[in-house]
């Protein structure tokens, strides 16, 4: 029953993810949704500046608190600990379960810490371990589901009763400024609905093509589909790198494609994704965001990631080797398969 729960005491539950990656918060959204609509919990996210705008656009996150990720200094640990302790949490859930993070969270006043880890940890009665090894369904499920099931540790009977009632329609509401920014970007583009977004950059995976391979793909795709608009997503750190590559390979191509340089606000990417026909990207934060938003995509994935990071429409070009290990033949095959998948998608 959405919005209410037979669980009478209002719980206070925190997600600990003060990391710099977009994927950390995105992969946790179904977990946070369940915490709100199964337990009617007060949901607090302790995160980084990177994810702030996204978190504040999601109605089932009650509070977003920025923490310092670098806690090697005692004063930073104390500051983070004091911030967390203010919330008197019933549960805290670290997204990553390294020894340093767990030991830090043990020093807070959170009653219980829900973790999944194979690290050797000093026993604490406050630990609640999530064991996937005895659950065949979860062993073979995607990471969104595996993170979601950490919520089951709070009250398994209630979770099992209510989980099938949840729709997981996660709407990320962008603001007027984001809509206007994307409106302005598309102002000089003919037929914006015929746009393909390409996001070539990824910190999360080694399974990817090189920039020059993406440029070769774009060049061939432009020739085959001149009516399509190809948009490349960059940011402050990657923009110049992309321009240098395209300038070396084919400077004329720059005049026939579009580049959206994001300013760091994730909600710009959300609004852009909602406007395009399809996303082409490796297994990355942008792809996971498209999955949550139910946007069609073609993913450059390892076989492992097709299981653990499956996309909305499960449409992949498989890469059997990491980027640095790809031969010329491997790259040609991947580009050929991308073109085939794009043609297949456009026929539907």
What is each of the regions a protein language model found here?
Residues 1-348:
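Catalytic machinery of carbohydrate-active enzymes
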């Amino acid at each position: 029953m959405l919005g209410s729960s037979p669980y009478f005491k209002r719980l206070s539950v925190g997600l600990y993810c003060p990391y710099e990656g977009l994927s950390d918060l995105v992969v946790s959204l179904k977990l946070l949704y369940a915490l709100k609509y199964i337990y009617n919990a007060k949901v607090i996210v302790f995160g980084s500046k990177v994810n702030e705008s996204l978190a504040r656009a999601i109605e089932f996150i009650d509070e977003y608190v920025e923490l310092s990720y670098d806690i090697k200094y005692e004063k930073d640990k104390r500051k983070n600990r004091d911030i967390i302790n203010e919330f008197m949490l019933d549960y805290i859930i670290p997204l990553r379960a390294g020894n340093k993070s767990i030991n830090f969270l043990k020093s807070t006043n959170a009653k219980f810490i829900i973790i999944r880890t194979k690290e050797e940890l000093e026993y604490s009665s406050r630990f609640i371990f999530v064991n996937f090894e005895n659950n065949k369904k979860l062993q073979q499920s995607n990471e969104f589901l595996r993170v979601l099931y950490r919520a089951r540790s709070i009250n398994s009977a209630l979770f099992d009763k209510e989980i099938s009632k949840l729709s997981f329609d996660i709407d990320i509401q962008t603001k007027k400024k984001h809509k206007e920014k994307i409106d302005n970007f598309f102002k000089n583009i003919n037929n914006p609905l015929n746009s393909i977004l390409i996001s070539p950059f990824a910190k999360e995976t080694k399974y990817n093509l090189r920039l020059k391979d993406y440029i070769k793909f774009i060049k061939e795709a432009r020739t085959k589909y001149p009516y399509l608009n190809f948009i490349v997503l960059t940011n402050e750190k990657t923009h110049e790198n992309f321009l240098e590559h395209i300038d070396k390979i084919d400077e004329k191509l720059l005049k026939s494609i579009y580049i959206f340089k994001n300013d760091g606000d994730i909600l710009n990417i959300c609004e852009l994704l909602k406007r395009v026909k399809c996303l082409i990207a490796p297994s990355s934060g942008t792809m996971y965001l498209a999955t949550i938003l139910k946007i069609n995509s073609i993913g450059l994935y390892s076989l492992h990631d097709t299981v653990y990071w499956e996309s909305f429409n499960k449409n992949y070009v498989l890469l059997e080797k990491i980027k640095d290990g790809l031969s010329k033949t491997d790259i040609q095959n991947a580009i050929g398969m991308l073109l085939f998948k794009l043609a297949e998608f456009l026929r539907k």
